[in-house]
Structures are given as structure tokens and as C-alpha cells.
Design a protein with these regions (language model features):
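Core catalytic lobe of class I
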Residues: 1-4, 9-302
Length: 302
């Protein structure tokens, strides 16, 4: 995270660069060509609620709105890239199939509970026909990792590991000897069922070395990612998305909306095509996210 909050005082299309960040002031589609492969993407775009100029009027238009962005995220992502996708419940549900179709694997949904202060004075009990909404959601996705096989196809990680070991002609039980464990290799790393566990890079490197020395001769190194070079522990570990656990945090985050000095105000621009005259106290963004949420997401997944 940057050490300071950058206040946007005008609308000139001028980028702001620092040692730890580049803030592009303009259409993000113009920034993608120079975008380095991201470790983490945090998306807070269209919600389908007319929330800003360019937002859609309903969730129905969100797939078309996000399609060019999802294409760029998918094109430039690394195997270990994670994505936080902010939206309404129905907005996220609408875009979810698009993300899945582009190789993003759903992990979980985080709910921001803003509490009763978010709706205080804004609910007419005589006319409302649903529970008042005090939430937004942020879905966590990771890249669906597939790896190349000897015959030119691809397999998911779990299936690929089994296929590489079987390619050696060795019985699965000898993977335990290769890893120096009692039964963890066959019970976790090479199992075909739901008990599968991502093996540490050290164990994959050990299996690769063992199959090279004891398996059938092959011109393609066992467990090689590119089919030419032998796998190293660090290379394998780099394929896995980062997760930094914090005790006590769950997938429900309770916090009131921003009403302090962190809230961006005073642009005198209407934040959506709505009928009101903005003042110096009007929020610049109707759904501005708290910095502590941003810090939490970045720390957890990068």
C-alpha cells in the first residue's frame, strides 16, 4: 500500500507515479497495454446501479461492460494472480459466469455489512417491499491453473501431478519414498479424490529427481512446466496464489460507511446521472471503499 492518500483535485488526465505505485487518471483500457503482470487485481467498477457516469442502469448490462476488462485481466495475469471483485450481490452473480469462462476460479464471497447507519432515515416502511440493503460484496477469484502434458494437451494440477508420476512407470507407492514421508505423497499429493493437497515445491522437486533416476527414460523431464527444463522448488511454489491468514477475520466485514476525513468530497461533479446539485460536502464516489478494507485485501492475497 502507498504511504499516503492521493487527493484528486482536478480532472486533468495526468498520471501520478511514485516508488510504489502508478495512479492512472483516465480510462483503464488505455493503461492495460503497459500493465505489468499483476500479483493481485482489485476491481471496483460498474455495479448496474447508475452509480457513476458510465455505469449501467441495471445488472443486465454488466457482462458487456466488464467483458473487455476481464479479457485484459485474463491475458496479463500470472498463474498465481488473484482477483477481488467488488459489486452488489446480483451484480457479482451476473458477472460470475464471465469470470469462470475466462479461467477465473471462484474461492469465496466476502460481505461488507455497513450496519443500520447506512439506511437511517432513508427507508419508508409503508412502501418498501424487501429488506433494506446494507451490504456490498467482494468475491475472491484465482486463476484456474492447467499444465501441459506430453501429448500436447493440458490437465488441472491434481490430474497433471498423477499423470507425470504415472508417466515414469513407477508405482504410486514409491512417491512416498521419493518425498521421504510415510504416506503423505499418495494420500495427499497424488491422490485422485477430494483429499488432494497442493504439494510444496520441495516435494515436487524430489519427485522429479526420483523419477528421473528411477523411471523410464524420457526426453521430456518429469514434472517439467515447459517440457524442457527440470522443475525447481521455487518455480513450483510461484505457481500458487498467495494467501496470508489472519486469525479472527471471517468473510463478513462489519464497518459503517465512510463519514470521516478519508471520504473524498468536493469535486462538485455529480457522481451519477441523478437529479441533485453537488456541494463541497457531496461525496465524490457513492461507494468509496475504506482504506483498511483495501489494505486487508492486499495483505491477504499478495
Amino acid at each position: 500500500m502507498a504511504d499516503k492518500v492521493i487527493r484528486i483535485k482536478d480532472l486533468r488526465p495526468q498520471d501520478v507515479r511514485g516508488d510504489r505505485y502508478t495512479l492512472h487518471r483516465g480510462n483503464v483500457l488505455d493503461a492495460y497495454p503497459d500493465w505489468e503482470a499483476p500479483d493481485l487485481i482489485v476491481s471496483d467498477g460498474a455495479y448496474g446501479v447508475r452509480g457513476f457516469r458510465g455505469d449501467t442502469v441495471s445488472a443486465d448490462g454488466l457482462v458487456d461492460w466488464y467483458a473487455p476488462h476481464v479479457a485484459q485481466w485474463s491475458k496479463r495475469a500470472k498463474p498465481s494472480t488473484s482477483l477481488w471483485f467488488w459489486n452488489t450481490e446480483v451484480g457479482w452473480a451476473t458477472v460470475h459466469p464471465l469470470l469462470e469462462a475466462n479461467g477465473w476460479e471462484y474461492v469465496q464471497l466476502v460481505t461488507w455489512d455497513k450496519g443500520l447507519s447506512h439506511i437511517a432515515g432513508n427507508v419508508n416502511g409503508n412502501t418498501i417491499r424487501q429488506f433494506p440493503v446494507v451490504t456490498e460484496v467482494s468475491a475472491l477469484y484465482r486463476r484456474r491453473l492447467t499444465l501441459p502434458t506430453e501429448d500436447g494437451g493440458v490437465l488441472g494440477v491434481q490430474q497433471w501431478l498423477r499423470a507425470e508420476w504415472r508417466r515414469s512407470g513407477l508405482p504410486l507407492c514409491r512417491a512416498n519414498e521419493a518425498c521421504g514421508v510415510k504416506n503423505a505423497a499418495t494420500r495427499k499429493y497424488l491422490t485422485a479424490d477430494w483429499l488432494w493437497y497442493w504439494p510444496p515445491g520441495e516435494m515436487v522437486e524430489r519427485m522429479a529427481e526420483y523419477t528421473k533416476n528411477n523411471g523410464k527414460p524420457t526426453s521430456r523431464p518429469y514434472f517439467s512446466i515447459d517440457g524442457h527444463t527440470e522443475i525447481m522448488a521455487e518455480q513450483w511454489d510461484s505457481l500458487r496464489a498467495v494467501w496470508n491468514h489472519v486469525n479472527g477475520l471471517t468473510n463478513v466485514w462489519s464497518r459503517p460507511p465512510l463519514h470521516d476525513g478519508e471520504r473524498l468530497k468536493g469535486t462538485l461533479q455529480r457522481s451519477a446521472p441523478r437529479v441533485y446539485k453537488p456541494s463541497k460536502q457531496s461525496a465524490a464516489h457513492l461507494n468509496q471503499k475504506p482504506l483498511d478494507f483495501m489494505d486487508r485485501q492486499i495483505h491477504a492475497a499478495s
